Amino acid sequence: MKISAEQIQENWAQLQNVINTTYEGERLKNILLLHDHFKDRMMLAPASGTKWFHNAFPGGYTAHVLNVIKWALEYYKMFEKMDMHVSDLTKENVIFCAMFHDLGKIGDMDNDYYITQPDDWKAKKWGRPYDHNPELHWMSVTDRSFWLLNQFNIPMSQQEFLGLRMADGLYEDANKPYFFEGAEWKAIKSNIGFIIHYADSSATRWEKEQYMLS
């Protein structure tokens, strides 16, 4: 599965529009700087390295980000409709977390996270067209996302921190204390982490279906 060069350009333009209509002031300036720095990489990056995971093709990353934003806004509206606690959240909080939940998959300031699979056999037999770049320092995708945002002086609220931290749910061991609280005083006070995790899971499942049914 792949998308056209025209679709890649259209997705990038759509992401830029979301940025320009969501943020303002210093935050907008720095988020634009981040996207300008990584533009070529972001436009062509895959969302995963394995075909049957999701969006393992050029342009897959940006397409996934847009899908997660769409799903996150739908979950946000549904939570509000069902009288869940969302009074501590804004649309900007939700979009911010959806937009940057996988930022770590871009790599570091100079190096891609994914590289073209050097092993032809793995690419063909295992369906892995991409491999992880061994030149990078190892970090979880979430931790690298925080690090990259810090490089561009992009601060976040506590809610936004939780949204990014919890995005991968229990697929990431570091999230266990957030989902298995263990004590009443540790109970999560915001639903942002659940909204983003459900949005990421739903978008990923939808993308996987496009591959499975194509």
Regions found by a protein language model. Give the residues of each.
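Short intrinsically disordered terminal tails
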Residues: 1, 213-214
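Acidic/His-rich, divalent-metal-binding segments that scaffold phosphate/diphosphate chemistry
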Residues: 1-123
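Divalent metal-dependent catalytic cores for phosphoryl transfer on phosphate-bearing substrates
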Residues: 55-57, 63, 84-212
